[in-house]
């Protein structure tokens, strides 16, 4: 589960390495986020020469969580880390590469570009 003040690793090459969650989008009473949720975050660590800088406020989509997710076929998947991919306002990724596996649940949303860039979809 992702909530306010959670720190997530960034799974793309946009220049950010770690982000801190400011808000989970999707209504006024949303307290926690899971895979596929869009968040507003600030960049806490960044690599030099990247697209985004430290302190920038960005939008991101959660692609991996330690908490995991239940699937309709009865299986359960969880990851070793919490990670997100930075996105633009049109839900396209800011980076050109995605690192690490992502969950299949992103396929049904508006994130097919992220799914196609990912090296592994679980």
Curated annotation (Swiss-Prot):
| Record keyword Oxidoreductase present | no
PROSITE patterns (alphabetical): RIBOSOMAL_L14
Any single GO molecular-function term of the entry would be: large ribosomal subunit rRNA binding
Alphabetically sorted, this entry's keywords are: Ribonucleoprotein, Ribosomal protein, RNA-binding, rRNA-binding
InterPro entries tied to this protein? Ribosomal_uL14, Ribosomal_uL14_bac-type, Ribosomal_uL14_CS, Ribosomal_uL14_sf
Question: What Pfam families is this protein classified in?
Answer: Ribosomal_L14
Name the record gives this protein:
Large ribosomal subunit protein uL14
* Tagged with keyword RNA-binding: yes
GO annotations of cellular component type: cytosolic large ribosomal subunit
What gene is this protein translated from? rplN
Q: Which CDD domains match?
A: Ribosomal_uL14 (cd00337)
Single biological process term from Gene Ontology? translation
Q: How does it assemble?
A: Part of the 50S ribosomal subunit. Forms a cluster with proteins L3 and L19. In the 70S ribosome, L14 and L19 interact and together make contacts with the 16S rRNA in bridges B5 and B8.
Question: Origin organism of this chain?
Answer: Limosilactobacillus reuteri (strain DSM 20016) (Lactobacillus reuteri)
